[in-house]
């Protein structure tokens, strides 16, 4: 299973809250800076089980991941968490309502390669030190066939995310806002010009 999320709400706490509720999974992120490696190791020690890492560095996956290596790292849990609004790797542009949304294709391609479920997941802060984790409807498996229907997958994920985001718009992180671009008010027949403008920002 691959859980995809956004830079929304207290996203940094999501891996720990999932583990606290018995949902063991590994989140993909950029490598920790050297000055924080000691703290990172300490955090890992507080988040059992020890044989399933809390985080997996993007450098460990690489641009051409070996599935056997990833399965070995994930261990028996087989769960991976990834952000889809990061400006890293191959990108996909999906029109949604009055916006053009940029998303990374890595989680989608990995789910297709692993034949894994792709599930939208968001965490929100409902009050001080109170959080709710929202699991959306998984992406239909036929969208993940070979080749995957990227636009259909992107639209499905955005529809699921929007049900939560519209209730808590103040919890949008700046990185999430940077992944959204306004569409012209009168619409556009060819999105390529809008995509080009977005890529040039």
Question: Where are each of the predicted segments found?
Answer:
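Catalytic core of membrane glycerolipid acyltransferases/transacylases, capturing the structured
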Residues: 1-60
């Amino acid at each position: 299973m691959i859980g995809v999320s956004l830079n929304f709400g207290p996203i940094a706490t999501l891996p720990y809250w999932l583990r606290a509720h018995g949902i063991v999974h590994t989140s993909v992120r950029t490598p920790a800076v050297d000055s924080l490696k000691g703290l990172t190791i300490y955090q890992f020690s507080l988040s059992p089980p020890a044989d399933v890492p809390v985080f997996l560095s993007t450098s460990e996956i690489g641009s051409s991941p070996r599935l056997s290596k990833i399965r070995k790292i994930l261990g028996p849990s087989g769960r991976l968490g990834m952000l889809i609004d990061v400006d890293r790797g191959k990108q996909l542009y999906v029109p949604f309502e009055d916006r053009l949304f940029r998303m990374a294709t890595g989680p989608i391609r990995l789910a297709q390669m692993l034949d894994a479920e792709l599930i939208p997941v968001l965490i929100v802060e409902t009050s001080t030190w109170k959080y709710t984790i929202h699991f959306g409807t998984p992406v239909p498996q036929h969208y993940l066939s070979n080749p995957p229907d990227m636009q259909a997958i992107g639209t499905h994920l955005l529809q699921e995310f929007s049900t939560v985001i519209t209730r808590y718009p103040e919890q949008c992180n700046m990185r999430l806002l940077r992944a959204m671009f306004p569409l012209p008010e009168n619409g556009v027949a060819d999105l390529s010009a809008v995509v080009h403008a977005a890529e040039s920002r």
